[in-house]
Amino acid sequence: MNTIKYLTIIILAFLFVQCCEKNIQGNEKRITIDLEERTETSVFDLTDSITVVPLHTSDSCLIATINQIEKKKDTLYIYDMQQSAFLCFKTNGSYLFRISDKGNGPEEYQHIEHFSVSETGEIFLLEPWGNIYQYSNKGVFKQKIKLLHVLESYNEIYVRGNSIIIISVSGDILYYSLSDGTYQCFHLYERMNAFFPIKRTSIYNDSIMNVSLFDNQIYKITQEGLIPSWSWDFKDNNNSEQNIKKLTSRITYNPNDKSVLTDYVGKGKPLKQFIYTSCESNRFKIALMEYNNSFLHVFHDKMKHKNWVFKRTKENTIFHTCTYTDNTFIYYDQPFTRGWRNLTCITEEILGDKYNVYTNLKNDSDSNPTVILFHLKE
C-alpha cells in the first residue's frame, strides 16, 4: 500500500510540474529583453531546416513579381500585382492553379490590395475599396462580399474561422463576421506620416494579433476590440510616454511630408527603438526592430526561456528581408533588397549543397523567382 501511495505522489508531482511549465511557457505576459546584450546566433539555432523551392516555370504560371506570399502547410500562395494574378504552388515547386479574374464582370476584380488564406485553404482577395472575392481551396470562385463604406481604404485582410479583419492605413480596423454579416469598427490611432499600421498584424494559431506602434504591446483583435495579450519590455530602451506624446503631436498626417521612419528613431531622436513587426511561432516570440540606426532581431525561446538578440546571424542572414507565415520565414529575391543597407540573406554556408540549385535558378532569367523557406524549430 505504501508503495502505491509513493508512486501516486511521484506521478502527481510530475504532472503538476509539467502543467506549471506549460502554463509558464504559454502565459508570459511580459518578455524582458536587454537590447545591448547581444547573442552570437547561428541561423541553425533558430531553424530546423531550410528549403529551396524551384517554382515550376511554364507559360501558364509565369510570375513577374511577388508582391505577397503566404504559406499554409505544404502550399504556397503568391500574388503578382503586375499581372493581377494569384498563383498557387506546392512547397516542392509543383504548380497547382492560377486565379486571373481581372475585369469588370460581377465575379471579376479590378485591383487586389492584399489576400488571406483560411485554415481550410479558402482564398480571400481584397480590393482597396472594400470588395472581397472568396474562392475555394481549388481556386473556384464562391462569392463576392461587398463591405459597407466605413473605412477610408481597405488595405490588409486577415481571416480566421468566421472572422475577417480589415486594416486601413487610416489607422482603423474593421471586424466582419462571415456567419451573419455583422461588423464592428475600431480606431487604432490617428494617421501619421512615416508610421503606418500596415504589416503589423500576424496570425498565431487561431488568433489575429497586432503590435502597437510605440509601446511594444501585442493585442489580440476580436469582435469586442483589441484585447491586450502580452508585451515586450526593453527596460531602459522602452519609449517613454512623454516622447510618444511629443512625437504623435509632431507628425500629424501631411501627404506632402517626405520624412521617413528612421528620421524619428535612434540616438537623439524621439524614439529609442521601433518594432517593424512582431510575430509568434510555437517555439518563439519574435520582434524585428529598428535600433541604433540598424536592424535588430529579437527571438525569445518560449521553451528554454532564452533570448537571442542579434543584428545578423553568424552566416550573415537577416530576416527583415523575409515574410513570416506558418512557422516559416520566406525569402524571395527582391531587387530593392540587394543594395538596401547592404543586406545579404542567402549564403553558401546556410544552403550547403543546395546553394548551386539556388544560384542556377537565380541566374536563369527565364525561370520563376526563387523562394527559400526557413522552417523555425518547433
Identify the residue ranges that each predicted region occupies.
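Short coil/turn segments at the loop-to-beta-strand junctions that recur within blades
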Residues: 59, 100-108, 147-153, 189-194, ...
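Beta-strand-rich domains and repeat architectures in extracellular enzymes and scaffolds
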Residues: 50-84
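Conserved blade-ending motifs and adjacent loop-strand segments that build the rim/top face
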Residues: 230-246, 303-327, 333, 339-340
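Blade-loop segments of beta-propeller domains
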Residues: 56-60, 94-120, 127
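C-terminal motif of bacterial Sec signal peptides marking the signal peptidase cleavage site
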Residues: 17-19
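Short beta-strand elements that form the blades of beta-propeller/WD-repeat-like
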Residues: 32, 75-80, 121-127, 162-168, ...
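Repeated scaffold domains used in trafficking and secretory/extracellular systems
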Residues: 65-68, 110-114, 150-159, 193-201, ...
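Blade/loop signatures of beta-propeller domains
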Residues: 23-55
